[in-house]
C-alpha cells in the first residue's frame, strides 16, 4: 500500500505500509445471525475475568491506558501507591492513577455472566472457612501427637537418670561401711541434693504414667503462662480411663472454650488409639460444646465458667492463690 502526502507545498513525501502475510490473508469474522451458541469452559472464562493481583474475579474494573490490562480498582491503586509505578503484568510505566480509567462495560459483562455475584462470593468464603477449619484441626492433632512424643522421651530420660542416681547411691553406701567419716560426709551432701530433686519434681507438674499433660504455646508473645490441674468432676464424671487428672501449662490469653476444645480433641485422639483406628473423623466432630468447665468456690460449690472468659481473668476472679489453678471438667448434658 503506497500513499503520497503533500507537505508545505513542496515535493511530496511517499510513505509505504508493508502488510504482513497474515494481514494480507485474513478476512473479517462473520457475524452469527442464526442463534448459534458457543460453549466456553468456566475455567478459561474465569482466567479472562480474573484480576492478576488478587487472583479473584474483577471488581470495579480499572484498565491501564497504555497497555490495556485490567485490574480491580483497589488492587491496582494499592500496587501503584506501594510499588514501582508500573503495570504488574507487563511492567510498563504508569505515572499515577491518571494512567488508569474505569471500565464499566467490563463490569456489566461480568454481571451478565454472574448475575448472582453475592452468592458466588459467599460460596467462596464458605469454602475458605471449611478449608481453614480442617487445616486447624490437623495442626492441633499434630501438635498433640508431637507433645506426647516429647513427653515419652522425657519420661524415658528421667527413668535412666534415676537408675544412674540409684546405682551411684548404692556404691556410696558400700564404701561407707569401710569409712564412717566418709559416709557421714557423703550423706550430708546427698541429703540436700535428694531434697532438691524431689522439690523440682513436685513443682514441675510433669507427666505420670496414668496422667496426661499438654503444653500449649502462648497465643501471644509476652503473655503470662498459667499452670492448670485439670480434674474430672467428682460427681458428674464416670470412673473410666478418660477420667484422669491432666496437667496443662498454657497462655493466660487462652479461653475456657479453648480448654474445652482441647479436651474434646484429646479424648477423641485417645479413643482412636485405644481402638487402634486411624480414622480422623472423630477429631473433625470434636467441639468445645462437648465439655463444661467448672471451678470450685470457697463454699465448696462448683461454678460453671463462661466459655469466653480468659484463664487470666478466671485466675484473678476465682483463684487468687499462687499455685496451679484447679479446674474440673464434665460432659455437657446436651452431648451425653
From Swiss-Prot:
Cross-link (Glycyl lysine isopeptide (Lys-Gly) (interchain with G-Cter in ubiquitin)): 112
Pathway: Protein modification; protein ubiquitination
Modified residues (N-acetylserine): 2
Cross-referenced PROSITE patterns: ZF_RING_1, ZF_RING_2
Principal location: nucleus
Reaction equation(s) it catalyzes: S-ubiquitinyl-[E2 ubiquitin-conjugating enzyme]-L-cysteine + [acceptor protein]-L-lysine = [E2 ubiquitin-conjugating enzyme]-L-cysteine + N(6)-ubiquitinyl-[acceptor protein]-L-lysine
Positions bearing the Glycyl lysine isopeptide (Lys-Gly) (interchain with G-Cter in SUMO2) cross-link: 249, 323
One MF annotation (Gene Ontology) recorded for this entry: zinc ion binding
Compartmental location: Nucleus; Cytoplasm; Chromosome
Region (Interaction with HIP2): 2-179
Phosphoserine: residues bearing it: 41, 143, 168
Span of zinc fingers (RING-type): 51-91
Keyword Cell membrane included in the entry's annotation: no
InterPro entries: RAWUL, RING1/RING2, RING2_RAWUL_dom, Znf_RING, Znf_RING/FYVE/PHD, Znf_RING_CS
Region (Disordered): 157-208
One GO cellular component, as annotated: MLL1 complex
EC number(s) from the headed UniProt entry: 2.3.2.27
Effect recorded for residue 98 to A: Nearly abolishes ubiquitin ligase activity on histone H2A
UniProt key word Cell division: no
Keywords on record: Acetylation, Chromosome, Cytoplasm, Disease variant, Epilepsy, Intellectual disability, Isopeptide bond, Metal-binding, Nucleus, Phosphoprotein, Repressor, Transcription, Transcription regulation, Transferase, Ubl conjugation, Ubl conjugation pathway, Zinc, Zinc-finger
Annotated disease: Luo-Schoch-Yamamoto syndrome: An autosomal dominant disorder characterized by intrauterine growth retardation, severe intellectual disability, behavioral problems, early-onset seizures, feeding difficulties, and dysmorphic features. White matter abnormalities and delayed myelination are observed on brain imaging.
Function of the protein: E3 ubiquitin-protein ligase that mediates monoubiquitination of 'Lys-119' of histone H2A (H2AK119Ub), thereby playing a central role in histone code and gene regulation. H2AK119Ub gives a specific tag for epigenetic transcriptional repression and participates in X chromosome inactivation of female mammals. May be involved in the initiation of both imprinted and random X inactivation.
Quaternary state and interactors: Component of chromatin-associated Polycomb (PcG) complexes. Component of a number of PRC1-like complexes; these complexes contain either the polycomb group ring finger protein PCGF1, or PCGF2, or PCGF3, or PCGF4, or PCGF5, or PCGF6. Part of a complex that contains RNF2, UB2D3 and BMI1; within that complex RNF2 and BMI1 form a tight heterodimer, where UB2D3 interacts only with RNF2. The complex composed of RNF2, UB2D3 and BMI1 binds nucleosomes, and has activity only with nucleosomal histone H2A. Part of a complex that contains PCGF5, RNF2 and UBE2D3.
UniProt protein name: E3 ubiquitin-protein ligase RING2
Gene from which the chain derives: RNF2
